[in-house]
Curated annotation (Swiss-Prot):
Stated role: Cleaves peptides in various proteins in a process that requires ATP hydrolysis. Has a chymotrypsin-like activity. Plays a major role in the degradation of misfolded proteins.
Keyword Hydrolase on entry: yes
Top-level taxon in the UniProt lineage: Eukaryota
Molecular function GO terms recorded: serine-type endopeptidase activity
Family statement drawn from the similarity comment of this UniProt entry: Belongs to the peptidase S14 family.
Organism: Populus euphratica (Euphrates poplar)
Protein name stated in the entry: Probable ATP-dependent Clp protease proteolytic subunit
Keywords: Hydrolase, Protease, Serine protease
Entry EC number(s): 3.4.21.92
Intrachain disulfide bonds: none
Reactions performed catalytically: Hydrolysis of proteins to small peptides in the presence of ATP and magnesium. alpha-casein is the usual test substrate. In the absence of ATP, only oligopeptides shorter than five residues are hydrolyzed (such as succinyl-Leu-Tyr-|-NHMec, and Leu-Tyr-Leu-|-Tyr-Trp, in which cleavage of the -Tyr-|-Leu- and -Tyr-|-Trp bonds also occurs)
Any single GO BP term: proteolysis
Length: 22
């Protein structure tokens, strides 16, 4: 996943959000 790409950043953000929301 490329951090510089909007889609990649959104995917990582959503993943981290889900992990932290557990």
């Amino acid at each position: 996943i490329a951090l510089q790409s909007p889609a990649g950043a959104a995917r990582i953000r959503d993943y981290l959000y889900n992990e932290l929301s557990k």
